Amino acid sequence: MILLADSGSTKTDWCVADGAAEICRIATHGTNPFFQSADEIAREVDGGLLPQLGNRPIEQIRFYGAGCAFPDKIAVIRDVLAARFTAADIEVG
């Protein structure tokens, strides 16, 4: 399954898909590594995303978000996600 994210500073829209089939949509508060620390982003993922995601086996993550234009900011998002989805191929842009 793939986890797609469209994130701005105020909200993040997540979609879980399996092939061409949409499995579910999840909405959380926004994430922006220019304005939030890795710890703040991690708390949002842990408290907002993971409880709604359940045990779904995520193989790929594509995170497209505000503030993800520079390598150091991309790394913040990638590191938070990689710590929680250890087997997933992660792309941040």
Model-identified regions with their sequence ranges:
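Glycine-rich, highly charged phosphate/nucleotide-binding loops
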Residues: 41-51
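Short glycine-rich, Thr/Ser-proximal phosphate-binding strand/loop in the N-terminal lobe
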Residues: 2-43, 57
